[in-house]
């Protein structure tokens, strides 16, 4: 990692972090002053563990739908290609602890879910790849370690 790269996460030393954690990965200010806050929501230890795609996919659907029940400030929830976490972005929602609360409430909702939203061929590009139980297991595991979320480097 000699030179700085354009992608923020490529500048993060993935061997130094300790999952689970939630870190502010970046902010952007729009032309009219709106601010976007992007969080790295890391469920699994990079290069050691990953989420299985059906569980990750269902958790993405559930979080994307359910988070918006807690705030209208959610812009996007996107899975990482490495399958170790998600990016969760908010607009004009600067308080880190409030973002953690939205995440915790959302994951608690996942545990109560009876079905995966938009889990059909009309609304989803890979409707056959879902696991509600897998999503619930991931949510439960992450919630159980909430006391660790702020500790990115395991210190």
Swiss-Prot record:
Keywords: Autoinducer synthesis, Iron, Lyase, Metal-binding, Quorum sensing. It catalyses: S-(5-deoxy-D-ribos-5-yl)-L-homocysteine = (S)-4,5-dihydroxypentane-2,3-dione + L-homocysteine. Its EC number is 4.4.1.21. Signal peptide: none annotated. Gene3D superfamilies: S-ribosylhomocysteinase (LuxS). It is an enzyme of class 4 (lyase). One of its GO terms (biological process) is quorum sensing. Fe cation binds at residues 57, 61, 124. SUPFAM superfamilies: LuxS/MPP-like metallohydrolase. Binds 1 Fe cation per subunit. Its cofactor is Fe cation. Transmembrane segments: none annotated. GO terms for molecular function: iron ion binding; S-ribosylhomocysteine lyase activity. Pfam families: LuxS (PF02664). Homodimer. Belongs to the LuxS family. Involved in the synthesis of autoinducer 2 (AI-2) which is secreted by bacteria and is used to communicate both the cell density and the metabolic potential of the environment. The regulation of gene expression in response to changes in cell density is called quorum sensing. Catalyzes the transformation of S-ribosylhomocysteine (RHC) to homocysteine (HC) and 4,5-dihydroxy-2,3-pentadione (DPD). This is S-ribosylhomocysteine lyase.
